[in-house]
């Protein structure tokens, strides 16, 4: 009986190992939710990207600030939290609801909300660090500026279906980068 108990304890510890490497306890479901959100974004596509080529734009995703190779572990959670919050804000706007299938949009936003809750839980665990490093504030500003450019683009294009399609594809890339960052940080430990 004692061996079985010890074995189960080891299994429990090992099952949480990948999520503990970030210095916080992200639920194991976090990666699954992230993948599901990416899948939902693909399903939300209403137009062929080819029909919206004239509307394509480089929003300047801050890869150098958020990129998987440059960002440090201590910066990751606040930056990923900001990225997720900005995506959620964008897709819960009243203009967004007119652009997408309501069921897919609700599922996507629910997943984003859960991802955000996971990340905010990690932020609370890191609360003992009072001041943000300058590089972290710089990264947060870069994420906010990036989403400001997206918001301005949508406004300039009057929230047209093609504008939303361009933004959907851009958000997929941003969310995919965040998933890669988490995977890299988990591997580093």
From Swiss-Prot:
It holds the Pfam family Interferon. Residues 1-23 form the signal peptide. GO terms for cellular component: extracellular space. Its main location: secreted. It is found in: Secreted. Keywords: Antiviral defense, Cytokine, Disulfide bond, Glycoprotein, Secreted, Signal. One of its GO terms (biological process) is defense response to virus. Glycans are attached at residue 101. Not expressed in fibroblasts upon virus induction. This is Interferon alpha-6. The lineage of its organism: Eukaryota, Metazoa, Chordata, Craniata, Vertebrata. The gene is Ifna6.
């Amino acid at each position: 009986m004692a061996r079985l108990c010890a074995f189960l304890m080891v299994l429990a510890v090992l099952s949480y190992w990948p999520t503990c490497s970030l210095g916080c306890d992200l639920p194991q479901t976090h990666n699954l939710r992230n993948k599901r959100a990416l899948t939902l974004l693909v399903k939300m596509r209403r137009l062929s990207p080819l029909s919206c080529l004239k509307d394509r734009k480089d929003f300047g995703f801050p890869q150098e600030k958020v990129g998987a190779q440059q960002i440090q572990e201590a910066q990751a959670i606040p930056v990923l939290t900001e990225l997720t919050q900005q995506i959620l804000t964008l897709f819960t706007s009243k203009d967004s609801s007119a652009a997408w299938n309501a069921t897919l949009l609700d599922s996507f936003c629910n997943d984003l909300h859960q991802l955000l809750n996971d990340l905010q839980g990690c932020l609370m665990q890191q609360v003992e660090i009072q001041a943000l490093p300058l590089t972290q504030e710089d990264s947060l500003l870069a994420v906010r500026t990036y989403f400001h450019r997206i918001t301005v683009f949508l406004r300039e294009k009057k929230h047209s279906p093609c504008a939303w399609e361009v933004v959907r594809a851009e958000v997929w890339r941003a969310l995919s980068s965040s998933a890669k960052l988490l995977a890299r940080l988990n591997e580093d430990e």
